[in-house]
């Protein structure tokens, strides 16, 4: 037959420790836990093979292509310190393996098949290096941080949001009423909960109309530009686009999408529409913990965050560091920088395995949301800085005097923290003091401070 039939070890072809990575390669760092008795080189090579050109046996059609040009290569393996039988396997993929401008294809190749592999007990994709040559094939966020600030005319501080609760069960008119109260009180944005789509108790069109009325009314009263994230997520792409188009016709500034449950293909279509039609796009990461929570299997959220920046979104939820959902500070700040900055140096202490150059792809605003309230404001201002959206759902609507006073309390706390920071005070040390001082002249804030003074989500 002219080729040697049979099964041969992956590492003979796909483990190449002397390979020099190219500037155009897509690089991946996998955390590999091999089955007992499987050498790490073989496990790493198996991942490289099965996520690129390889299959389990030699096939005669291998002779019709240049494997050297197209194969993924495992070029380095290191043990994970402090973990038994875990290794980081670095794999380089030639650029030509991937369709341009398709996060869907990127993920299908790199994580599509290998995670059920028998030779591995567990596998986790920790990071991806996206080369500029591939970055340039994506539109990325519809607008980005600077354009968003210019559209909203809001500078020098984080933006404030609030998710309308109870998330399911309100009628459209009462929902709009809650939106109006929050925006009038001083928030920049209110938000549809991620699971509010178009249910029997509140159809999407009714909600869109009442929310638009609420935000225009609040805008007229406060003289500030307001937004409500209208969730366009739907059961079909066509229906999603229909909702986005209706939002644009209402003249609202921003829509929202659940990018993991909706899928990358739908998300990228929506992002293109948003750029073409001047809509901002807020992204919720519902379902991320299914993929990213296990430490040894799945995908780290920083990979999902990079994927979103390519697919497109102007805001994305990124954990809080301080609220009810988990996230370590340095690691969170690592992927927050990956979302916002143009160029991020490799830094293993923050979980960043590769230097990432986004060239001119716009940045994404990280959203801190989940169990946060006024006492967290100094820490949030300190940790996230100006380019972020701080979202207080219960922390606004749970105010004893109602939504508008809840919004006032948050806005006063934020302005006090920003002012204190600008005066050179150390928010990490003096934060509580800053909030207490502000509460002296804001009864709304004083009431909020009283309600949440003891709340901690420590487990």
Swiss-Prot record:
Gene giving rise to this polypeptide: rbcL
Reactions the enzyme catalyzes: 2 (2R)-3-phosphoglycerate + 2 H(+) = D-ribulose 1,5-bisphosphate + CO2 + H2O; D-ribulose 1,5-bisphosphate + O2 = 2-phosphoglycolate + (2R)-3-phosphoglycerate + 2 H(+)
Active site location: 165 (proton acceptor), 284 (proton acceptor)
GO molecular function: magnesium ion binding; monooxygenase activity; ribulose-bisphosphate carboxylase activity
Protein name (Swiss-Prot/TrEMBL): Ribulose bisphosphate carboxylase large chain
Cofactor detail note: Binds 1 Mg(2+) ion per subunit.
Purpose: RuBisCO catalyzes two reactions: the carboxylation of D-ribulose 1,5-bisphosphate, the primary event in carbon dioxide fixation, as well as the oxidative fragmentation of the pentose substrate in the photorespiration process. Both reactions occur simultaneously and in competition at the same active site.
Binding site for Mg(2+): 191, 193-194
Organism phylogeny: Eukaryota, Viridiplantae, Streptophyta, Embryophyta, Tracheophyta
NCBIfam families the UniProt entry points to: PRK04208.1
PANTHER family (alphabetical): RIBULOSE BISPHOSPHATE CARBOXYLASE (PTHR42704), RIBULOSE BISPHOSPHATE CARBOXYLASE LARGE CHAIN (PTHR42704:SF15)
Domain of life: Eukaryota
Family annotation (CDD domains): RuBisCO_large_I (cd08212)
Naturally occurring in which organism (per UniProt): Geum quellyon
GO biological process terms, semicolon-separated: photorespiration; reductive pentose-phosphate cycle
Keywords recorded for this protein, A-Z: Calvin cycle, Carbon dioxide fixation, Chloroplast, Disulfide bond, Lyase, Magnesium, Metal-binding, Methylation, Monooxygenase, Oxidoreductase, Photorespiration, Photosynthesis, Plastid
């Amino acid at each position: 037959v002219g080729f040697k039939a049979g099964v041969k070890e992956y590492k003979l072809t796909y483990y190449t420790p002397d390979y020099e990575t190219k500037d155009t390669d897509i690089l991946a760092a996998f955390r590999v836990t091999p089955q007992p008795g499987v050498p790490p080189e073989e496990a790493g090579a198996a991942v490289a093979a099965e996520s690129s050109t390889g299959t389990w046996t030699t096939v005669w059609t291998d002779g019709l292509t240049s494997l050297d040009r197209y194969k993924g290569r495992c070029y380095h393996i290191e043990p994970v310190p402090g973990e038994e039988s875990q290794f980081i396997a670095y794999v380089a993929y030639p650029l030509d393996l991937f369709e341009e401008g398709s996060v869907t294809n990127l993920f299908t190749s790199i994580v599509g098949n290998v995670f059920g592999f028998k030779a591995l007990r567990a596998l986790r994709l920790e990071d991806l290096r996206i080369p500029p040559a591939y970055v340039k094939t994506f539109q990325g966020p519809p607008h980005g941080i600077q354009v968003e600030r210019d559209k909203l005319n809001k500078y020098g501080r984080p933006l404030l949001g609030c998710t309308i609760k109870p998330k399911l069960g309100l009628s459209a008119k009462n929902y709009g009423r809650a939106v109006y109260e929050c925006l009038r009180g001083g928030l920049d944005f209110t938000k549809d909960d991620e699971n509010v789509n178009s249910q029997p108790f509140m159809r999407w069109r009714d909600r869109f109309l009442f929310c638009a009325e609420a935000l225009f009314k609040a805008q007229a009263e406060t003289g500030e530009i307001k937004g409500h994230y209208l969730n366009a997520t739907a059961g079909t792409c066509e229906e999603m686009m229909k909702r986005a188009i209706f939002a644009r016709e209402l003249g609202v500034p921003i829509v929202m999408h659940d990018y993991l449950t909706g899928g990358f293909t739908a998300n990228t279509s929506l992002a293109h529409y948003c750029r073409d039609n001047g809509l901002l796009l807020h992204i919720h990461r519902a379902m991320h913990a299914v993929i990213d929570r296990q430490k040894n299997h799945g995908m780290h959220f920083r990979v999902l965050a990079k994927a979103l920046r390519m697919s497109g979104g102007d805001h994305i939820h990124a954990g809080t560091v301080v609220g009810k959902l988990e996230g370590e500070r340095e690691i969170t700040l690592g992927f927050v920088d990956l979302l916002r900055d143009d160029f991020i140096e490799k830094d293993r202490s923050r979980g960043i395995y590769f230097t990432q150059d986004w060239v001119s792809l716009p940045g994404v605003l990280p959203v801190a949301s989940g169990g946060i309230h006024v006492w967290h404001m100094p820490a949030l201002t300190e940790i996230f800085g100006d380019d972020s959206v701080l979202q207080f759902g219960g922390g606004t609507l749970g105010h004893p005097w109602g939504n508008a006073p809840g919004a006032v309390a948050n806005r006063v706390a934020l302005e006090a923290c920003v002012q204190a920071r600008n005066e050179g005070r150390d928010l990490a040390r003096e934060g509580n003091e800053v909030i207490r001082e502000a509460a002296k002249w804001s009864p709304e804030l004083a009431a909020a401070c009283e309600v949440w003074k003891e709340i901690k989500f420590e487990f």
